[in-house]
């Protein structure tokens, strides 16, 4: 499926399940849902998600190197100072591990680790370490929805990775007619759900 179809599906299901009652809650749900919808395709070479996590990994390495240099040159331990702020430290730990896992996921074959039950639960567990259900639940729902949608694809997914067996219902192609119809239907339903939610905000 195309990324816009995955996003539409993830947002529709997440919004329908969570039913946010505030503007910040709505934005958080959509943001976390969009991340969950797009993350599995980090393994698609040169995709937007792949390039994003390549840049994030480069930035992470740069920050680590700079921290070591600052410690060596000025005897300032940034790690220790950040650790004094326990909540911030825990968030940074989750984000750092998530970036590393996503970078490693980008180096696996398409529709393997990031499209598996194993990958789904590892990514969700990493987020759960620091973030609450306002973020974790829509992420989980959308990542799972992405996996289920790709099972419809003719090429299938390695749902039980690291086993190589690929599960496929062979009902459609990534950019075929079914994908276009699904995107249209999901988009219309998402708009309807958003209108219904907005009446309660």
Task: Please name every model-derived segment.
Residues 1-201:
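N-terminal membrane-targeting hydrophobic helices
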């Amino acid at each position: 499926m195309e990324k816009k179809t995955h996003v539409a599906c993830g947002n529709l299901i997440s919004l329908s399940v969570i039913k946010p009652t505030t503007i910040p809650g709505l934005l958080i749900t959509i943001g976390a849902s969009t991340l969950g919808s797009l993350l599995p395709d980090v393994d698609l070479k040169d995709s937007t998600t792949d390039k994003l996590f390549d840049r994030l990994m480069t930035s992470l390495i740069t920050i680590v190197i700079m921290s070591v240099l600052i410690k060596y040159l000025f005897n300032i331990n940034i790690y220790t100072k950040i650790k004094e702020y326990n909540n911030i430290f825990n968030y940074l730990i989750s984000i750092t591990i998530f970036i590393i896992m996503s970078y490693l996921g980008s180096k696996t074959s398409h529709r393997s680790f990031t499209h598996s039950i194993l990958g789904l639960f590892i990514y969700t567990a990493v987020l759960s370490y620091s973030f609450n259900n306002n973020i974790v639940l829509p992420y989980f729902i959308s990542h799972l929805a992405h996996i289920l949608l790709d099972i419809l694809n003719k090429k299938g997914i390695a749902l039980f990775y690291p086993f190589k067996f690929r599960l496929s219902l062979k009902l459609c192609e990534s950019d075929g007619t079914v994908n276009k119809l699904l995107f249209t239907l999901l988009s219309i339903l998402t708009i309807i759900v958003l209108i219904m939610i907005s009446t309660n905000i």
